[in-house]
Amino acid sequence: MTVTETATISEKLSQSQILRDYERAFSEAPTGDEMRAMKVELESAMRAGAIGFSTSRTRNHQTPDGQPVASRVATWDEVRELVGVLGDLDAGIVEIANEEAGRDPQAQREYQVRLRDLAVESGRPVTFGMFSSRRAPDIWPPYFDLLDETAAMGGRMFIQAHSRALNVLMSFETRLPFDKFPVWKELRKKSLADQEAGLRDPVLRARLVESANGNHEEKQGVGAEMRRPDYDWLLVMDSVAGPHRTVADLARERGKDPVEVMIEVALEHKLKVFFRQPLFNEDQDHVLAMMRHPRSVVTFSDSGAHVSQIMDSSLQTHVLSHWVREKGALSLEEAVRMLTLEPATAWGFDDRGLIRVGMAADLIVFDPAKVAPLMPEVRHDLPAGARRLVQKAAGISATVVNGQVLMRNGEHTGVYPGQLLRGPLAAAR
């Protein structure tokens, strides 16, 4: 193991384990006996070292056949009962992927009250990610007000705030919104070199443009799935920092169809260019306000999910390069605290986050004048040659984990000093 990791126990996992019948976990409420068994499993996981309980209520989390994941069909009473186990143990954190309450203020408030009461009644910290959206720019502030409201009632709640837009990256090296259309599907089966040759054929290119603009029956994309592009918000990521031009702007400038422009831009870069589609956090003033809130923590990641679609590992280097060095919106000291002590404190790890005798020796050695994310790259090093996105950084000379130099100037030193960091109940044994 290279880095220090932790684990939570998920509601989906405990449901599937206890109900045994996979289909029942996705369609039926547990019986009284099954609910008691789920609570036993949750306590067992906490005593084995889990740092908390996680669950999902968001429509973005579906099975491959488009059905809700098991936790989405659970009642809120089931969630309360399971979180109550953590309250009884006086340990652990509750992480939740939020319900979509829509734009109805009453529905939003009803959900926020449930979240608040969950934190207050259980006595356990509740956390979730929050973003702004160009489609609903007023959705996020009430959730930040909720943090203060919960604290005033004796509960603990914090929001995980991203440091930039949350983007889906698409490219000829990975996936495009048109891949499922027959003429595109035939092209995309070929090697990158053969795709490039095909795209230079004006006859084939015309067919591709026509196909992409056709009236296709398409289901609404969820999460990081490909969807029909919004060209006014589809940007050419030809550099890390930008500014990035939109495909719509380039199409108007060149007097061509947006799909034609995407093909042209890709050919100009030998097909090695990303188009980024922001899903959330388009307004960077909103991003900064969320980061600065005293009850937010600057962190967010889908971890092992969407590895060929989303690249969030540059969240921290973006804080240091963009918000500190380029914008001057944060001091270096503020930013370092946001990225180290505040997450450690929020998740209850009081042995790390500071450089102090007796604390965990996890350090990043960087040059404030040079630290920055590099361009994402595509690698095919997962099992069966599956692809993933990788993003490295400039200006970091060393990464120290548990007192050992793990990375030096961007290269792995060959040591594996990471460990599974267990929660307080396991540590107390």
Tell me the role of every PLM-derived stretch:
Residues 1-4, 8-18, 25-69, 74, ...:
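Active-site neighborhoods of metal-dependent hydrolases
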Residues 49, 160, 255, 302, ...:
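Divalent metal-coordination and catalytic microenvironments
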Residues 87, 120, 152, 252, ...:
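Hydrophobic alpha-helix feature that most strongly marks membrane-spanning transmembrane helices
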Residues 240-241, 344, 388-391:
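Short loop/turn motifs at secondary-structure junctions and domain boundaries
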Residues 273-281, 287, 332-336, 344-378:
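Acidic, glycine-enriched loop/beta-strand segments at the rims
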Residues 289-296, 301, 313-315, 364-419:
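C-terminal cap of metal-dependent C-N hydrolases
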Residues 353, 398, 429:
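Ligand-binding pocket scaffold of soluble enzyme catalytic domains
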Residues 420-429:
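Short, solvent-exposed cationic patches
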